[in-house]
């Protein structure tokens, strides 16, 4: 196995050890973390609802969202290995205004997203526990965030890196099994079922929300760059290994989005039941309909899939937003390096703020989550352009990647303008 020295120094001035080229299990980390974070919000809720409401029709939008966002997520990995810095540091170099925009969005998203996924995880855990336990969703949410907090504060990145790989293996295995079982015994369509069409302006908000977090909000690329930086310092991975990790994580996330769409199609599409749109009510309905279709024995299987989705997303959101906000704070204060106390503070902020949202604003959580998804899509062209321009300034992109990136910006920008025009009443 050959070795080489890292060309770019660490952003914090650390001296990195000798790199080892080649394939091993240890190279996987940031890509798997991103996939774990993505699956909870966009996949379990939005993808499954898309299948339940419109069958296979919106599969093309899921594919297009993944295809056209790919280069801008990939640039996070490229930028870290090219410069030794996070994307957030790159935003700060371009303009403090970009840093402030990202910081404000991240502060809001941290508590809304963490609160939403924690509440869903708590509700699903309640489905799995015997009725005799008698714990409320709030109590279960406190238990979940306490586990996440101690896990992240005590173990930091290394422990998170190791555990999420096993979470992803369990999640993928259980999801594939659940979909295969549902495909073998799909819901029988009612005789008078009339398929609804999503291709109208009235459905545009749903499609934008679906694509906003598909596979994740584009500002999550900056969080991925924080994980990539931590992985690079911990294991001194090469650029090629980092890209392999990213590509595997992104591909797994994209494929699972279609599997969750299939779950909605096989279990709910054409059943004649009105599909719930609120996240908590929808998960309850999905589990009950899956059980009614497949059999009572399958309740724990689909509940386990749902819980692993949300628990994995909860812990990765808390860590990711904690790291991103700590990096923003470091750059705003002009400090040389990020420290564990700052990460611990902002991780606690995400978890504690999310818990406060659950406690006092649980009734508005669905609206907040939809707002977060839509705002993520509207801001996607901005962060896409930033990521593209940062990487382009450091290395010459191939003609194919350059054209691909421009096509992605046109797609994201065009859809955003269409949605804003519809919202303003200019069209429709």
Residue ranges and their predicted role:
Residues 128-153, 169-180, 337-356, 378-387:
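Transmembrane alpha-helical segments of multi-pass small-molecule transport proteins
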């Amino acid at each position: 196995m050959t070795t080489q020295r890292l060309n770019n120094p660490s952003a914090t001035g650390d001296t990195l050890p000798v790199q080892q080229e080649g394939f091993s299990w240890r190279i996987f980390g940031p890509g798997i973390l991103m996939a774990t974070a993505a699956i909870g919000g966009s996949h379990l809720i939005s993808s499954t609802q898309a299948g339940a409401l419109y069958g296979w029709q919106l599969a093309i939008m899921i594919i297009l969202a993944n295809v056209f966002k790919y280069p801008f997520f990939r640039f996070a990995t490229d930028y870290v290995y090219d410069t030794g810095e996070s994307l957030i540091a790159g935003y700060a170099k371009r303009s403090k205004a970009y840093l402030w925009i990202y910081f404000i969005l991240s502060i809001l998203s941290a508590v809304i997203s963490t609160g939403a996924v924690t509440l869903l995880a708590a509700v699903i855990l309640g489905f799995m526990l015997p009725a005799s336990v008698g714990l409320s969703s709030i109590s279960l949410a406190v238990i979940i965030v306490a586990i996440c907090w101690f896990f992240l504060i005590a173990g930091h990145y290394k422990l998170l890196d190791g555990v999420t790989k096993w979470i992803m293996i369990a999640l993928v295995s259980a999801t594939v099994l659940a979909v295969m079982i549902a495909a073998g015994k799909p819901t029988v369509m009612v005789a008078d079922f009339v398929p609804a069409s999503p291709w109208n302006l009235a459905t545009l908000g749903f499609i934008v929300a679906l694509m906003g977090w598909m596979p994740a909000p584009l500002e999550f690329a900056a969080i991925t760059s924080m994980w990539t930086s931590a992985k690079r310092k911990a294991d001194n991975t090469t650029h090629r290994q980092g890209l392999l990790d990213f590509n595997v994580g992104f591909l797994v996330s994209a494929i699972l989005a279609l599997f969750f769409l299939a779950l909605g199609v096989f279990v709910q599409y054409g059943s004649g039941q009105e599909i719930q749109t609120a996240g908590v009510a929808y998960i309850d309905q999905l589990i009950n309909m899956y059980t009614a279709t497949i059999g009572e024995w399958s309740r724990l299987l689909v509940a386990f899939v749902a819980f692993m989705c949300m628990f994995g997303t909860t812990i990765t959101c808390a860590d990711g937003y904690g790291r991103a906000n700590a990096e923003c704070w470091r750059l705003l204060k002009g400090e040389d390096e990020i420290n564990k106390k700052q990460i611990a503070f902002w991780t606690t902020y995400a978890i504690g703020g999310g818990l406060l949202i659950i406690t006092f604003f649980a009734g508005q959580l669905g609206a907040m989550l939809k707002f977060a998804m839509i705002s993520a899509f509207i801001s996607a062209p901005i962060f896409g352009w930033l990521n593209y321009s940062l990487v382009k300034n450091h290395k010459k992109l191939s003609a194919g990647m350059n054209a691909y990136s421009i096509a992605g910006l046109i797609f994201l920008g065009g859809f955003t303008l269409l949605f804003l025009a519809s919202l303003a009443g200019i069209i429709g």
